[in-house]
Amino acid sequence: MTTDALTALLPFIVLSAAAVAVMLAIAIRRSFRLVFWLTVGGLLAGLSTLPHASSVAPLQVTDLLRVDAYGLFFHALFLLAALVVALLCLAYFRRRENENEEIFVLLLTSTLGALLLVSSAHLAMFFLGLEVLTISLFPMIAYSVRASRPLEAGIKYLMLSGLASSFLMFGMAMVYGDLGVLSFEQIGAHGAELEQKPLALAGLFLILAAIGFKLSLVPFHLWTPDVYQGAPTPVTAFLATVSKASVFALLLRFFTAAHAERSETFLCVLGLLAVVSILAGNLLALLQVSLKRLLAYSSIAHMGYLLTGFVAAGLLRRDLQTETIAFYLAAYTVTSLTAFGAISALSDDDRESDRLSDYAGLFWRSPWLAAVLTLSLLSLAGIPLTVGFVGKFYVFAVGVQAETWPLVATVVIGSGIGIYYYLRVVLTMIQPAGVGQRVTLHPAAGTALAAAALVILAAGLFPQPLIDAAANVPQPPPTADSPQRLTATGGLP
């Protein structure tokens, strides 16, 4: 293996070494704080390797793995998100007796799976990366073994993930049986004839069904509210951000390589999934009295917004499609981390602060925490001066440019419904204070929330740096198309 290849693989090597180091530390001497600092050190070391990997990118390291600026953008996003989740885990799990340090090993391995997933260039690596991510998530979801709800959530996720993996493997087999290839590039070479390849087209739809499960797209969403509610809140934060963002980034890489935009049937299916996900997610969120379930249904709607941007921008220019998805995923990730981080900070030793009634009078008990949660909800709603508004503006703008009017109308209707249930939570927090203890915020959780809230505000008020970063992410695979962008003002088979 060449020096350039080793340099490109540095983020994966460092994260793998960090996971092994944490396991050895646990085996030698159990210390929650030591393991936490090893995890943070591993994530920071992974971040420090990204400039070195970028210096040799783009590079096809093997037939399975491609390291390029597209993947490295999401590597940075996922490592930063995992760092925030590690801080939330320190504050959340150290308050609970008999909670062991293995949560940090699982956090590192699941993050490694996300990095592998977004850098996949072959369906085999797609499957391997997805399984590394998913298998690490099973015990994370069921981690609080003393409670029945996390265990139930873990079993549900395990069973339905197995079904999704079956769809994925069967779809891969059908694609290989019809085309004789599994690499994204070689599948793309058959893109013009996919409509005349019914077996391969059916295989792609099965792969889409597996991806739809991971993204909670309707009708593959039924696991989402129960798992979000049952999992420990820091794990829910990871599941809602890194897990979903990595799968969507892979969706963009795979289906653009396969030239799916040439298939009218495929675009119609994606558009239909976007419409029903937006409407179902928002309407079901109206009925919730649990904040975590409300955010679960909200996440379904946000995946629909992302699909809208995927379809509409893909009809215009590929580089605009990448810019739209990259910006929206970054905005959604930081906003969701803030919302779930606030819920995690409010949870006590005995139970999660999950019911809306738990937030009554929060503004009077903890004004700062209420302000952070309010900011995250306003960003999810797409209110101006937040990063969520800029992300939703991207989706709306590309929809108008592409003249996909049914999708644009659905985004407007869904956003209007979303404003109602997000503001319902805000109004609950400013009700007169009842009986309730003042909230004591752990320094780790406070640091994570302060940083995330600052990003929401800064990127909402001054979005151009993040827009530039998203615009500089090349389309996977690179194209020769001239750039069009939005600005703040406008070997194996």
Swiss-Prot record:
Give the record's family classification: Belongs to the complex I subunit 2 family.
HAMAP family (alphabetical): NDH1_NuoN_1
Q: Which InterPro entries match?
A: NADH-Q_OxRdtase_suN/2 (IPR010096), ND/Mrp_TM (IPR001750)
Q: Which GO terms describe its cellular component?
A: plasma membrane
Locations listed in the record: Cell inner membrane
Protein name as annotated: NADH-quinone oxidoreductase subunit N
Q: Which organism is it from?
A: Methylococcus capsulatus (strain ATCC 33009 / NCIMB 11132 / Bath)
- Give one GO molecular function term: quinone binding
Q: Name one GO biological process term.
A: ATP synthesis coupled electron transport
EC number(s) per entry = 7.1.1.-
Keywords for the protein's UniProt record, in alphabetical order: Cell inner membrane, Cell membrane, Membrane, NAD, Quinone, Translocase, Transmembrane, Transmembrane helix, Transport, Ubiquinone
Membrane topology of this protein: Multi-pass membrane protein
According to the UniProt record, where is the region Disordered?
473-493
From the record, give the transmembrane residue ranges.
Answer: 8-28, 34-54, 71-91, 102-122, 123-143, 157-177, 200-220, 232-252, 266-286, 294-314, 325-345, 370-390, 405-427, 443-463
Catalytic activity, per the record?
Answer: a quinone + NADH + 5 H(+)(in) = a quinol + NAD(+) + 4 H(+)(out)
Work out whether the entry's keyword set contains 4Fe-4S. no
- Where is the organism placed in the taxonomic lineage, from the top? Bacteria, Pseudomonadati, Pseudomonadota, Gammaproteobacteria, Methylococcales
